[in-house]
Amino acid sequence: MRGCPRTGFPWLSAGAGHNRGVDEARRDRDEEGRARNARPRDGLGRPLPYGTPGVERQPEGVVRSPQETVREAQRLLDAGMPFHAHEVFEDAWKSGPDAERELWRGLAQMAVGLTHAARGNSAGGARLLRRGASAVEAFGGRDPHGIGVGPLAAWARELAGRVEAAGREAAGPGGDGGGVDAAAEAPRLRPGPREDGR
């Protein structure tokens, strides 16, 4: 068998190994026929084995008012479900006005950053928290829809620093440590007390 002239590894035939085609007949599909993984998920969005009870997934493509978006995302963040909150922000990002897309995208990135931090991925979590903070800072001073942009950006940067330091301490340079408690670290999207009194 001839190999690659650069690496010497043997050529693999089409369909070998990970390049094998997907059996479209067995692939999970949604009601519209689009590919969608039907495996249950945990509160941080991680796939669970088929048949395992999971957390109900957020419906995709829901158009909400900004107030509904903030209220639903805050509820999910407070429940320790930042992955699901990111999906709510993503709907607003995709359906909202162009002038606000970066705001919703930044909030989605912060929610995914918290998700990664809770899963123990300190490097990815810190990176996304900072990226989201930078995106929302462009809206500083305006606090669109009552969202406390300045305090949110400060929260994200502070958490990114703690997560990064904990990851280095737990696993050495560039490593990942234990995850944070997503509910305990949930940010306040709007200044003021939580609706649940905590």
Regions found by a protein language model. Give the residues of each.
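N-terminal alpha-helical interaction modules that lie
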Residues: F9-G96, A135-R198
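Residue signature of alpha-solenoid helical repeat architecture, marking inter-repeat boundaries
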Residues: V63, R101-L103
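TPR/TPR-like (Sel1-like) alpha-helical repeat modules
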Residues: S122-G140
